[in-house]
Amino acid sequence: ITLICRLAKEKGINYKRVTETKLNNMSRGASHQGVIAMGACAEYVSLEDILSIANEKEEDPFIIICDEIEEPHNLGAIIRTAEAAGAHGVIIPKRRSASLNATVFKTSAGAASWLPVARVSNLAATIDMLKENGVWIYGTDGEGQSYTEVKLTGPIGLIVGSEGFGMGRLIKDKCDFLL
């Protein structure tokens, strides 16, 4: 198992050590030999790909940014809602986030099959890159303005914070507006 973890790290593959009980639950009683691999059901795209999609449509970018959404059902619901709202894509962090899996696809009602999702190493740096491309960053926060009081036009990146804690401090500090 140590070798598998070392090789995964060398290849930039995320891994997580869990308890035997967790492995048993994940394998649903099947033999796991102490290791379970989980892969994405779809390929991720780059941030540039999402910006290009908006550009090709001659539209201002509308991007949903997920800050540590860990529950796959919630990520699927966000993707479904983003697609229905006309977003050009969704951004998720590589760490501390649900990934594209069967649960996300099912909950998204198929939207995860066609709405591009970018998985980034550094969410804060990605937000900076969006700002450099003229995108205004709106964060969802209990202390923000009501979205009905704001004219949401132009290039928009909308941040949705984690289930338990909302946006992290660094991410919140990067917002141009709070809703």
Identify the residue ranges that each predicted region occupies:
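RNA substrate-binding interface of SAM-dependent RNA methyltransferases
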Residues: 1-14, 52-149
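N-terminal positively charged helical leader segments and presequences
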Residues: 1-56
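Structural motif
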Residues: 34, 61, 132-135, 155-157, ...
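Short basic, glycine-rich beta-strand/loop surfaces that mediate nucleic-acid
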Residues: 26-40, 108-111, 116, 153-161
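Active-site/ligand-binding-proximal alpha/beta "capping" segment
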Residues: 138-179
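Glycine-rich nucleotide phosphate-binding loop and flanking beta-alpha elements
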Residues: 24, 43-45, 72, 98, ...
